[in-house]
A protein has these predicted regions:
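Beta1-alpha1 glycine-rich phosphate/pyrophosphate-binding loop at the start
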Residues: 4-6, 11-77, 175-195, 325, ...
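FAD-site-proximal beta/loop scaffold in flavoenzymes
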Residues: 140-157, 239-316
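A Rossmann-like FAD-binding core segment of flavoenzymes
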Residues: 92-95, 99-110, 117, 180-277
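Rossmann-like dinucleotide-binding cores of NAD(P)H-dependent redox enzymes
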Residues: 40, 73-79, 151-152, 157-161, ...
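Glycine-rich dinucleotide-binding loop and its adjacent helix/turn
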Residues: 48, 126-182, 186, 214-215, ...
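N-terminal Rossmann-like dinucleotide/flavin-binding domain of flavoprotein oxidoreductases
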Residues: 2, 42-116, 195-222, 344-346, ...
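Beta1/beta-strand and adjacent pyrophosphate-binding region of the FAD-binding site
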Residues: 1-12, 156-166
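Flexible, glycine-rich terminal cap/loop adjacent to redox cofactors
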Residues: 9-37, 42, 49, 53, ...
């Protein structure tokens, strides 16, 4: 049996960072990753980076094959860089499957070779996998893809169906629409973007439909099957025909390969690994970080989980999940939609003293310079404490602007401060002067 100070299962953001840090400090560290294609984790290889690379490449006058090749070049480069960075710190990297034999012993297997590893500290960083709904034919029909498979098609589908109207589905809808596919999004919910401000969601729906994307709500899928190479999506009322189908019906924590039944590690009702404020499971010394612990599925949350565990293992444990404040998010549709904090309806439900303001991008000089007048800014503020309660930024570059607002919220900077903040001109960010003049 091989003994380590730290074993990390999974090459994701939190795990790889922790492994490198502790190895650099002289600890004996092992990192186990079952797929060489996943060095660096989901974001680098099959998530944020390749999908945003595809979006940028789609804006250029490239063929479908060139767009895919561009994505593969960038992800391959970053994959190799991540491996080299971690290996360079002295971490023992095992390309193998890993599962638990007991609370502190894991077995790894590569082909026919098996090894047992043990450590007082084990970090589970296995991420999440696509949630396959129990729809007849979904898992067995050909030309049906998850969010990984849809990034690696050999040819552009003339007609693409997307099952699910969440962030992943809508981002791929915009991408493949730009590439030239006729895209139809079929969503089981009766409301488009239910977590967004209704006025912003209405604009997003309008723009996507103007761009040629068909958006269908309240769809009840009963079966998926093939007619030759075509995919037939059967609903209660109609049958839709596609050349390819993407199912984007959420992602769930990747716990099944771990064989946690051999341990005392507890799961939540939703199947995630249960953790405390230090990301530690109920088994002392065993931690779960990133998507597998049931938190928000963003790579920057995984990075913050690293900070929490590192504080516990190396520092005084003072930084915990309880210190995590406002978490911004961006959906990379066209234009990008970014949000942080509360919506107006949430503020009303909490019976807070609030005020709102919304201004269209069409009223912003930079929008005219960019030649793109689509979108709007909306803010929700507390009229008594002067705190910013939330904001929705729907415009080109919103993914950058939202971070300015998040910093202000985390540091309780009064919204009135923005009315006198000096911004460069012409920018979209300068319109925060007007947005917060409430």
């Amino acid at each position: 049996m091989l003994t380590y100070d730290l074993i990390v299962i999974g090459f994701g953001k939190a795990g790889k960072t922790l492994a490198g840090k502790l190895a650099s400090a002289g600890k004996k560290v092992a990192l186990v990753e079952r797929s060489k294609a996943m060095y660096g984790g989901t974001c680098i290889n099959i998530g944020c980076i390749p999908t945003k690379t595809l979006l940028v490449a789609a804006e250029k006058d490239l063929s479908f094959e060139e767009v895919i090749a561009t994505k593969n070049t960038i992800t391959g480069r970053l994959n190799g860089k991540n491996y080299a960075t971690v290996a360079g710190t002295g971490v023992d990297i095992f390309d193998a499957e890993a599962h638990f034999l007991s609370n502190k012993v894991i077995e790894i297997q590569a082909g026919d070779e098996k090894k047992e590893l043990t450590a007082e500290t084990i970090v589970i960083n296995t991420g999440a996998v696509s949630n396959v709904l129990p729809i007849p034919g979904l898992a067995t029909s050909k030309n049906v893809f998850d969010s990984t498979g849809i990034q690696n098609l050999d040819k552009l589908p003339e007609k693409l169906g997307i099952l699910g109207g969440g962030n992943i589905g809508l981002e791929f809808a915009g991408l493949y629409n730009k590439l030239g596919s006729k895209v139809t999004v079929l969503d089981a919910l009766d409301t488009f973007l239910p977590r967004a401000e209704p006025s912003i969601a209405a604009l997003a729906k309008q723009y996507m439909e103007e761009d040629g994307i068909e958006l269908l709500q309240n769809i009840r899928t009963t079966e998926i099957k093939n007619d030759g190479d075509q995919v037939l999506l059967v609903t209660e009322n109609e049958t839709y025909h596609f050349d390819a189908l993407l199912y984007s019906t959420g992602r769930k924590p990747n716990v099944e390969p771990l064989q946690l039944e051999n341990t005392d590690i507890e799961l939540t009702e939703r199947g995630a690994i249960k953790v405390d404020k230090h990301c530690q499971t109920n088994v002392p010394g065993v931690f779960a970080v990133g998507d597998v612990n049931g938190g928000l599925q963003f790579t920057y949350i995984s990075l913050d989980d690293f900070r929490v565990v590192y504080s516990y293992l190396v520092g005084d444990g003072s930084y915990t999940l309880e210190d995590r404040l406002n978490v911004p998010n961006t959906m990379f549709i066209t234009p990008a939609l970014s949000q942080v904090g509360l919506t107006e309806s949430q503020a009303a439900d909490l019976k807070l003293p609030y005020a709102v303001k919304e201004i269209p991008v069409a009223a912003m000089p930079r929008g005219h310079v960019n030649g793109d007048l689509r979108g709007a800014f909306k803010a929700v503020v507390n009229t008594e404490t002067k705190e910013i309660l939330g904001a929705s930024i729907f415009s080109e570059g919103s993914q950058e602007i939202i971070n300015i607002i998040t910093v202000a919220m985390d540091n309780k900077i009064p919204y009135t401060y923005f009315t006198k903040q000096i911004f460069t001109h012409p920018t979209l960010a300068e319109n925060l002067n007007d947005l917060f003049a409430i």
